[in-house]
Amino acid sequence: GLGDVYKRQIEETIDINYKGMVHVAKEAYPYLEKSCGQLVFYTSSSYTRGRMNYSIYSSTKCATVNFVQALAEEWGSLGIRVNCVNPERTKTPMRTKNFGIEPEDTLLKSMDVAVATAKLLVSDLTGQVIDIKLKLI
């Protein structure tokens, strides 16, 4: 839980999951403005409900969604679209490290997430959270 987390771990999670996203958006802005481009960020189901032992992680994922929605409104009049992908449990090295080996048929594959992201990029959506669920693939 939070009481057992080192300050360094808190800062690292916030730096990667929140500040990293903010800095990417800020640095990309001039290019996005010139090209009417778009940004896609990734969240997790933890954004909808805080998870025990994941308070910092969950709160940064919630911040991701709010940041995406705010930027979509802020930059929409410039033709810049900003969205968020929320993949269900996906087989990744980080997931395996945190949860161990899980049955293959219960996890999304990275390619599923990539295909859904590509479909989002060719859509006209902005300010949306796109849920990718195994049963929908």
What are the roles of these predicted feature ranges?
Residues 1-6:
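Short, small-residue-biased leader/transition segments that mark boundaries at the very start
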Residues 38-63, 68-77, 89:
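Catalytic loop of short-chain dehydrogenase/reductase
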Residues 84, 92, 101-137:
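C-terminal helical subdomain
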Residues 8-15:
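Active-site Tyr-X3-Lys motif and surrounding loop/helix of classical short-chain dehydrogenase/reductase
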Residues 33-35, 77, 126:
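Short connector loops in the HATPase_c
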